[in-house]
Amino acid sequence: MAKEELLEFPGTVSELLPNATFRVKLENDHEIIAHTAGKMRKNRIRVLAGDKVLVEMTPYDLTKGRITYRFK
């Protein structure tokens, strides 16, 4: 899959779930399940409830996503 096909949405982490997954409320009021991207894990970037994040999603499954950036 090419990177141009991915959709990016800003959102807020609403709940921490097991296995490094998070419930994220997007700005368009949808709730999805997201996990952290590999580069965020590698650089040990912590994501906590209430953090503003950027979520990358595929157009094929709009219920799951990947957190690619945590805003400061």
From Swiss-Prot:
Q: Where in the cell is it found?
A: Cytoplasm
Q: Does the keyword Protein biosynthesis apply?
A: yes
Q: Does the keyword Electron transport apply?
A: no
Alphabetically sorted, this entry's keywords are: Cytoplasm, Initiation factor, Protein biosynthesis, RNA-binding, rRNA-binding
User: Which molecular function GO terms apply here?
Assistant: ribosome binding; rRNA binding; translation initiation factor activity
What does the entry list under GO cellular component? cytosol
What's the chief localization of this chain?
cytoplasm
- So which domain of life are we looking at? Bacteria
Start and end residues of each S1-like domain: 1-72
Q: Spell out the Pfam families in the cross-references.
A: eIF-1a (PF01176)
The protein's job, in short, is: One of the essential components for the initiation of protein synthesis. Stabilizes the binding of IF-2 and IF-3 on the 30S subunit to which N-formylmethionyl-tRNA(fMet) subsequently binds. Helps modulate mRNA selection, yielding the 30S pre-initiation complex (PIC). Upon addition of the 50S ribosomal subunit IF-1, IF-2 and IF-3 are released leaving the mature 70S translation initiation complex.
What NCBIfam families has UniProt attached to this entry? infA (TIGR00008)
What family does this chain come from, according to its entry? Belongs to the IF-1 family.
User: Assembly and interactions?
Assistant: Component of the 30S ribosomal translation pre-initiation complex which assembles on the 30S ribosome in the order IF-2 and IF-3, IF-1 and N-formylmethionyl-tRNA(fMet); mRNA recruitment can occur at any time during PIC assembly.
Q: What is this protein called?
A: Translation initiation factor IF-1
